[in-house]
């Protein structure tokens, strides 16, 4: 969620898909042209052509599988890492829980669902050298079975802190699905 722009800006563009309309959702499907628009947006920002990562939502993966033979051939190349492959200069991954965006291109808050017409998951691309991740402390919680007379079970749980964010929000692009209600 933190790697996606809040809204469209010059340094973090939010683009919309341009494909054909899905009759069930009124969502415009992602096309290869849209992928190239993401690449062009990063090129325009001066982002180096190496270390570009693209995270596709499941809707956009399905759209591309329907239409693009090259994408279909590269899909699921490495089942161990989840990496789809490299296409158009991107290391491509798939993630089912990308943020929702409104039809106006504004990111919804963490936990908000796409419950309004025109709210869809996004796909996003970023330059890996402009993001960081930090893993914090891990704490283990444990209680012995003697303290659980009802079920006589040992309980174990963990708390782990982790963060992933932009160092500087100037090398990312978001693609959200366009919306076209039936006329």
Which stretches of residues belong to each language-model region?
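Long, contiguous amphipathic alpha-helices that act as assembly "spine/axial" helices in icosahedral shell
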Residues: 1-19, 43-58, 92, 145-166
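Alpha-helical scaffold segments that mediate packing/assembly in large oligomeric complexes
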Residues: 1-45, 174-183
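Sequence/fold signature of self-assembling virion shell proteins
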Residues: 26-30, 67-183
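Hydrophobic, aromatic-enriched interface-forming segments
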Residues: 29-74
